[in-house]
Amino acid sequence: MKIFVPGRTEIIGNHTDHQLGRVIASAVKPGMTAVCDKSAELTAWVRSDGRRPMTVDLSKLEPVKKEEGTTLALIRGMACALKKRGYTVGGFTAEVRSELRSGGGLSSSAAFCVLMGRVMSELYNGGDIDPVTLARCAQEAENIHFGKPSGLMDQLACAIGKAVYIDFATDEIIPLDCDFGSMGLTLCLTDTGGSHAGLTEDYAAIRRDMNAVSAFYGQEVLRYVNYEEFKNKGFTDASAALRAEHFFEENERVPLMREAMARGDREGCLRYMNESGRSSEQKLRNIRCTAGDDRLEKGIELSAKLLKGKGAWRVHGGGFAGCVQALVPTDYFRDYARAMDASFGLNSCCKIM
């Protein structure tokens, strides 16, 4: 049996998910494929892109400390989350082929988790495990077993397989029609070469800062903090307050972007994506990582030079490394891609929508 799971792109809603905010994300064409079958033993045998096979004993599903940060943890964690929800977990073999570079920003870990979930769904549960359940199981695998403080956006986009508007406070999940091409725009990503691997602490710091602000106002997350109270009753840590301000403003931009997409409003889409990008750079500050890798920063700067006045550009996903996302006039895309490739390597810039 062959199973495909797409990668994902975050269109708007940068670091809003873990504060129960809103986001628009979309599945993208690059993804992962597994050729799989049942096995007689209660083990998962997985070989990815021809590398050395991995074997996981599925009779032992508790988190294993030494597996944190590894693919083994994702396999075990996905099986654990499914079994906890009453689904059948059985042995399988899977040959995986991936078009998603690990740490490149298209959510390779989320796609892999969902892929493993789809394998177990198809082989042992009649393909009946719904996308939202697969996404929640994938989040649990990443958070508990892998040790990554992930939200739910990546997993939902990979599992649902199309553009989707998500409100994490209300659990509203609305599939969207996303046609930038009809607006004369091309959505693309440039992989700057930096990796998301090893950036867990940078991501965790954003979450800590936002949670510190929400706790100051007696709430668990920023979504339930009154914005007027936030503005009038100053939080003393200026750095954390800036990140909170990003959340409040970004969370209001998401439904505006959704409306602009629905009515085919080219200028609106460019405006809201640019506002999101500048807020991430200046307030959220997830462009340069603590390790000092500045390739993403250079990608943002080059995109600004190339697209100012005609397109939109922003950090993609978690940030600190990885990809620059851009909405480029379709008749200018070839020139933009050529310039980005010249700086970051052949085929580093690719059209995704």
Language model region names:
Residues 24-25, 312-318:
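Short, flexible, solvent-exposed loop/turn segments with mixed acidic/basic and small polar residues
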Residues 1-22, 68-181, 307, 332-338, ...:
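Gly/Ser-rich oxyanion-binding loop with an adjacent helix/lid
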